[in-house]
């Protein structure tokens, strides 16, 4: 570094650049700072003389000094800058230290705060747990106090009833004493009719429960026993007045009609035997071609059609050459057949004549009949007619003569075989649709009707109901073999005990006859107490559908809801179903004018019975009784404290009677030695068991070529219990078969039944075993049924008893070790149906359950993702079962939703036709409802919107199914509390329904109720009440046409069957049936038919019982109601007056039926403007109420209000005022100051004060009335049954509002 001068050696002389003189040499101090010019001079150009001057000799040090200075200067600058940086960094460091200290302090503060919060959280959690414990304790104490209060209340009510009864007894004795001493006794005032039929005084304990169950059946009018609960008759009657359509038909008539029409009685046969359309085909060898063509070409179409509606279809035919061998089977199948088809040409065989004689001649009205007569080709038709054999001509003449009602349908065909088969199919399809299933024949009418039925908010399974009906019928039939007289008497005594009463326990060993006793008792109750509502359930094999507690309670709840205006408020949540059943029971018990009995057979077989039946331990309402039967060995300990009726083994006399009766029925006589042998054998409890003795009798009387009577008897006495006897029965049944193939099939059949969920059907058996002929199957099943091994339930082959299943398990399945292989066989069978797109209720019931039992989770998930399987389960109300399957697979709610969405998207890609798009829309709607029930509201919107879009696009924006989608979507928004969106959708749905069906259709009423509930949630009570009233009016009108009950199609068919029962001689039973038919047709708004039957009933009762019998008053009352409905008030008035006159003379002065007639006659007088004539009737009704219930009962207040209203209409305000004031005091004392009845009475008083000019008082009273209305909106506008209900779109489920006092 430096300048060029640094290169000059020391001692050299450098010429002065300025030309100065030379001088002395001197040393330049290092400190001297050379000038910049000196440094720059070394770079100047030009010739210079370099000398060894003084300046040149000091230039090196000068250059170094300059360089040094420059470096020092740079260093100083660098040093200063670095010092500055260090100072800055120190300041930053100090600042960061301060920040660090601050943050450390904050951290310490936060840690302290965190510790404090943690301690507070722990203390809060501890307080929470303590609060929960206190709440649980409080809830337990509350429930205990509630139960104690309930017991106290009901005990006091019972005491009041007893006091009233004692009072009336004393009055009766006093009258008798007066009659003896003063002779003022008038027989016309007696409580007995001309036939000396006792009518129980109102309010006695016998009015709760009929004691005379075993006596001869009295006529309906002479044994009316209407229960008088603490609410009084006015509540029930006022409900009738509001609810109409049977506003003027007396409640005892309605209850009797419902009891005999809804509850299936054994003596009335069903149109379909065990849910199967059995087509009995009679043919000759000449018409065999038509039969084969029909079976091969058209039979499958009928089967698929019936399967789609939940029924089985079966062709029943016996080959002509083997028909004589199966004579017993032919008779049996003829009785079970739903429709009979005869195919004739020219000649007939003896077997054909026998079948035709049985079906077409002896019982032509028992089933629809179809005659196919094959003539020759058209060219030779005349010649062929003349070639009919004499036997054929005679047979046709007898058939024609027997067809008095012209029900026989004839197909006369002269064309080809294929055309003939097509004609048979066409007529048979029409018969099945119209006469057997009650469907309309309009184009696409059937499908639309089914969809409309499915669109309801309550989903339930017809097959469960059918199964229970058949179980009851079979138990009734089997009970006839035993004498249960002593047990029936004891049951009557236990049931008639004063409330509160815990459930009654019927215990016994398996097979002791518990089910038979309960069925017999139910049958007697239905016969003698038509006003009693009986709900029963018979459980089947363990793990079957009939043992599912959720399905059981749901079915019973639906049966309860039949007696409300709607059945659409039922939650789908399993826990809510179990929780809400006691509430519904209590609500119905408070309004039902009669008794309620719940009977559950084999309750210990129900899955987790003790946990799911907790409601049994709570006190029951006063008019409710519960009977349950249990196996004495498996009865829970907590239930053993209940009142118990134990069934003992049969005594020797009963054993001998059962065996003797069975032997006499088949014409077998036992020798003395054989009788002694049996008597010696049947001495232990196991061998005197009712089922054991019954099976023993069947085995002894069983016909078999390889088993003699002695051999059978010898083998039987070696069996010491029922299961071993069943195993012997299986061996006997096997040995009775002809071939090894049939024996193998029978083993396989029984093993498949054992492995299945609910059993298998006959048509499924024929599919599983193609080599098996129908006659061989029927013969095999007949033998097994006679040996008490199998039975039929809803078209399925099942075991009659659990011991039979255990016998098969031990004999054929090696103690359950081989059951898995048979389940796999069932899985393959139903999976094959699934692959063929045959998704029936059977596939949905069996396949998922079988896969679950086999623990095949992957295949189970695949079956559930078949959208039609899940849809079938969901739409039949098996929501809990569907959830259980998904839980078994290991999926939560969100995963289920995702899986279904993906499956639906895949299915949507394959949809092209209009029909497939309609099915897709149904699937989306089902998924939306399913997700809504799961509580996934946000995810439920998308499928419902997609369903709406598809229906609007594929069908029509104004199609009724679009309204259904709108309704369901609005329901989700209601749950979501998006009321504005919901209101818009409900209104749009209502507009579509009004355009499609008219303004008075049930779907319009549904939308009105939904809107009413919506307005109620928004506190718009006036709008809600207005819509609710409009809905009630619509339902009153449509109820006449739909019968109010969900089983209306069944009622319609029952009406035809009841008509057949009225064709016999005059009798009280026949007259009773005629009256019930009249009531039924009245409810259907078929007033002409109703008048015909009611008139016939009246005339028959007058002939049989006399014109002054109470039953005649009943018929007169109903005829009066009919004339009143037709606006024929003059005739109605005359009939009511005649009925009142009879009941005044025949019944007690305070009998409810008398009060009923008084009330309706008074209402008729008011309607006709005859107010003066109505006054004494209302006064008499008031007097009856006061005598029956005392002056402080709410029903007395209602009578006071009605009389006061009448006085107001007569402008007798001074007479009306004290009645209103007295009624107001009674209402306030008995119902509370905020009850709606108090508000209604205050409103009436306000109107009265206003009319008298006392405006200030009127304003005050009206203000109080409005305060009550606002305080109790749920009582005015209706209230949903549960805030946890899964359906926010449902309307009010409460009883209809009580009528205003101004009524």
Curated annotation (Swiss-Prot):
The keyword Cytoplasm does not apply. GO terms for biological process: cilium assembly; convergent extension; determination of left/right symmetry; heart jogging; kidney development; Kupffer's vesicle development; left/right pattern formation; pronephros development. Disruption phenotype: Morpholino knockdown of the protein in the embryo causes ventral body curvature, pronephric cyst formation and laterality defects, including reversed heart looping. InterPro entries: NPHP3-like_N, NPHP3_ab_dom, NPHP3_hel, P-loop_NTPase, TPR-like_helical_dom_sf, TPR_NPHP3, TPR_rpt. It comes from the Eukaryota. GO terms for cellular component: ciliary base; ciliary inversin compartment; cilium. TPR repeats lie at residues 449-482, 802-840, 921-954, 963-996, 1005-1038, 1071-1104, 1113-1146, 1155-1188, 1197-1230, 1239-1272. Residues 1276-1303 are annotated as: Disordered. Residues 81-183 form a coiled coil. It is found in: Cell projection, Cilium. Pfam families: NPHP3 (PF25022), NPHP3_hel (PF24884), NPHP3_N (PF24883), TPR_12 (PF13424), TPR_7 (PF13176), TPR_NPHP3 (PF24885). Residues 1283-1293 have a biased composition (Polar residues). Keywords: Cell projection, Cilium, Coiled coil, Repeat, TPR repeat, Wnt signaling pathway. Required for normal ciliary development and function. Inhibits disheveled-1-induced canonical Wnt-signaling activity and may also play a role in the control of non-canonical Wnt signaling that regulates planar cell polarity. Probably acts as a molecular switch between different Wnt signaling pathways. Required for proper convergent extension cell movements. This is Nephrocystin-3. It comes from Danio rerio (Zebrafish).
């Amino acid at each position: 570094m430096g300048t060029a001068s640094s290169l000059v050696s020391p001692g050299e002389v450098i010429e002065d650049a300025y030309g100065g003189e030379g001088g002395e040499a001197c040393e330049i101090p290092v400190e001297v700072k050379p000038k910049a010019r000196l440094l720059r001079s070394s770079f100047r150009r030009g010739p210079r003389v370099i000398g060894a001057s003084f300046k040149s000799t000091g230039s090196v040090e000068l250059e170094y000094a300059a360089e040094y200075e420059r470096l020092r200067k740079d260093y100083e600058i660098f040093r200063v800058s670095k010092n500055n940086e260090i100072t800055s960094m120190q300041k930053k460091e100090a600042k960061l230290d301060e920040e660090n200290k601050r943050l450390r302090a904050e951290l310490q503060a936060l840690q302290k705060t965190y510790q404090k919060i943690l301690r507070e959280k722990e203390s809060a959690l501890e307080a929470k747990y303590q609060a929960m414990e206190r709440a649980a304790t409080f809830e337990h104490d509350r429930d205990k106090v509630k139960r104690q209060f309930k017991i106290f209340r009901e005990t006091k009510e019972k005491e009041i009833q007893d006091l009233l009864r004692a009072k009336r007894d004393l009055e009766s004795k006093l009258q008798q004493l007066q009659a003896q001493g003063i002779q003022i006794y008038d027989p016309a005032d007696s409580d007995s009719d001309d036939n000396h039929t006792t009518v129980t005084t109102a309010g006695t304990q016998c009015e709760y429960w009929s004691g005379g169950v075993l006596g001869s059946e009295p006529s309906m009018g002479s044994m009316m026993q209407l229960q008088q609960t603490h609410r009084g008759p006015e509540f029930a009657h006022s409900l009738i007045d509001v609810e109409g359509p049977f506003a003027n038909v007396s409640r005892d008539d309605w209850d009797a009609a419902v009891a005999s029409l809804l509850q299936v009685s054994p003596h009335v046969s069903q149109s379909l035997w065990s849910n199967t359309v059995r087509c009995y085909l009679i043919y000759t060898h000449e018409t065999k071609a038509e039969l084969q063509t029909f079976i091969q070409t058209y039979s499958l179409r009928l089967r698929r059609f019936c399967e789609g509606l939940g029924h089985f279809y079966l062709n029943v035919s016996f080959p002509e050459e083997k028909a004589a061998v199966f004579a017993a089977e032919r008779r049996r199948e003829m009785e079970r057949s739903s429709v009979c088809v005869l195919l004739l040409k020219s000649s007939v065989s003896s077997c054909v004549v026998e079948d035709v004689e049985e079906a077409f001649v002896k019982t032509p009205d028992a089933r629809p009949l179809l005659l196919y007569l094959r003539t020759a080709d058209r060219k030779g038709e005349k010649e062929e007619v003349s070639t009919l054999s004499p036997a054929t001509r005679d047979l046709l003449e007898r058939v024609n003569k027997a067809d008095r009602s012209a029900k026989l349908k004839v197909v006369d065909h002269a064309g080809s075989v294929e055309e003939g088969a097509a004609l048979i199919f066409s007529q048979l399809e029409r018969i099945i649709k119209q006469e057997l299933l009650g469907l309309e024949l309009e184009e696409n009418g059937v499908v639309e009707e089914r969809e409309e039925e499915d669109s309801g908010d309550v989903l339930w399974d017809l097959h469960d109901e059918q199964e229970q009906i058949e179980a009851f019928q079979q138990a009734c039939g089997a009970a006839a073999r035993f004498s249960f007289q002593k047990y029936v008497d004891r049951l009557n005594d236990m049931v008639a005990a004063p409330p509160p009463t815990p459930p009654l326990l019927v215990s016994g060993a398996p097979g002791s006859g518990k089910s038979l006793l309960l069925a017999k008792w139910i049958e007697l109750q239905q016969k003698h107490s038509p006003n009693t509502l009986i709900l029963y359930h018979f459980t089947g094999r363990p793990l079957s559908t009939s043992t599912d507690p959720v399905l059981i309670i749901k079915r019973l709840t639906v049966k309860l809801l039949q007696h409300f205006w709607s059945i659409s408020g039922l939650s789908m949540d399993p826990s809510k179903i179990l929780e809400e059943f006691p509430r519904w029971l209590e609500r119905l018990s408070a309004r039902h004018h009669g008794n309620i009995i719940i009977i559950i057979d084999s309750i210990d077989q129900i899955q987790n019975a003790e946990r799911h039946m907790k409601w049994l331990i709570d006190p029951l309402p006063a008019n409710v009784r519960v009977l349950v039967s249990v196996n004495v060995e498996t009865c829970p300990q907590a239930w053993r404290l209940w009142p118990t009726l134990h069934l003992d083994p049969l005594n020797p006399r009963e054993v001998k009677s059962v065996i003797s009766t069975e032997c006499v029925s088949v014409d077998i006589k036992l020798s003395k030695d054989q009788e002694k042998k049996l008597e010696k054998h049947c001495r232990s409890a196991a061998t005197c068991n009712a089922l054991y003795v019954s099976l023993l009798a069947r085995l002894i009387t069983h016909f078999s070529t390889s088993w003699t009577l002695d051999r059978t008897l010898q083998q039987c006495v070696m069996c010491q219990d029922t299961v071993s006897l069943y195993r012997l029965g299986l061996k006997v049944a096997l040995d009775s078969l002809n071939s090894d193939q049939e024996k193998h099939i029978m083993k396989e059949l029984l093993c498949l039944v054992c492995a299945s969920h609910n059993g298998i059907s006959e048509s499924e058996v024929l599919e599983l075993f193609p080599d098996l002929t129908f006659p061989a199957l029927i013969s095999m099943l007949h033998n097994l049924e006679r040996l008490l091994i199998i039975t039929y339930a809803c078209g399925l082959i099942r075991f009659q008893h659990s011991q039979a299943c255990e016998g098969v398990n031990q004999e054929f399945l090696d103690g359950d070790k081989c059951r898995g292989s048979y389940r796999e066989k069932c899985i393959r069978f139903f999976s094959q149906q699934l692959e063929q797109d045959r998704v029936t209720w059977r596939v949905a019931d069996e396949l998922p359950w079988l896969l679950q039992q086999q623990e095949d989770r992957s295949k189970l998930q695949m079956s559930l993702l078949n959208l039609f399987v899940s849809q079938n389960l969901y739409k039949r109300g098996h929501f809990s079962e569907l959830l259980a399957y998904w839980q078994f697979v290991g999926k939560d709610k969100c995963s289920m939703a995702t899986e279904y969405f993906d499956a639906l998207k895949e299915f949507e890609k394959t949809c092209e036709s209009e029909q497939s798009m309609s099915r897709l829309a149904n699937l989306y709607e089902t998924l939306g409802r399913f997700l809504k029930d799961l509580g996934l509201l946000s995810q439920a919107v998308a499928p419902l919107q997609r369903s709406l879009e598809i229906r609007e696009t594929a069908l029509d924006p104004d199609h009724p199914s679009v309204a259904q989608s709108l309704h369901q979507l609005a329901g989700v928004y209601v749950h979501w509390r998006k009321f504005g969106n919901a209101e818009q959708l409900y209104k749009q749905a209502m507009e579509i329904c009004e355009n499609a069906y008219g303004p008075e259709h049930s779907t319009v009423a549904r939308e009105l109720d939904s809107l009413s509930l919506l307005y109620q949630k928004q506190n718009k009570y006036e709008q809600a009440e207005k819509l609710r009233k409009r809905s009630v009016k619509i339902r009153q009108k449509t109820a006449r046409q739909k019968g109010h009950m969900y089983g209306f199609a069944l009622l319609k068919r029952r009406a035809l069957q009841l008509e057949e029962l009225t064709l016999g001689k005059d009798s009280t039973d026949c007259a009773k049936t005629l009256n019930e038919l009249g009531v039924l047709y009245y409810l259907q708004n078929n007033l002409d038919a109703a008048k015909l039957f009611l008139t016939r009933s009246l005339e028959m009762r007058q002939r049989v019982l006399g014109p002054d019998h109470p039953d005649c008053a009943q018929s007169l009352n109903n005829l009066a109601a009919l004339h009143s409905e037709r606006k024929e008030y003059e005739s109605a008035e005359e009939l009511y007056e005649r009925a009142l006159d009879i009941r005044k003379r025949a019944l007690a002065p305070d009998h409810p039926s008398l009060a009923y007639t008084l009330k309706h006659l008074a209402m008729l007088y008011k309607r006709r403007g005859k107010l003066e004539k109505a006054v004494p009737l209302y006064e008499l009704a008031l007097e009856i109420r006061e005598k029956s219930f005392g002056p402080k009962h709410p029903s007395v207040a209602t009578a006071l209000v009605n009389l006061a209203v009448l006085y107001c209409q007569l402008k007798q305000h001074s007479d009306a005022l004290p009645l209103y004031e007295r009624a107001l005091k009674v209402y306030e004392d008995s119902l509370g100051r905020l009850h709606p009845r108090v508000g209604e009475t205050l409103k009436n008083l306000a109107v009265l004060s206003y009319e008298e000019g006392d405006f200030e008082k009127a304003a005050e009273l009206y203000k109080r009335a409005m305060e009550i209305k606002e305080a109790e909106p749920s009582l005015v506008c209706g209230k949903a049954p549960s805030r946890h209900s899964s359906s926010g779109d449902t309307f009010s489920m409460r009883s209809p509002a009580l009528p205003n006092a101004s009524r």
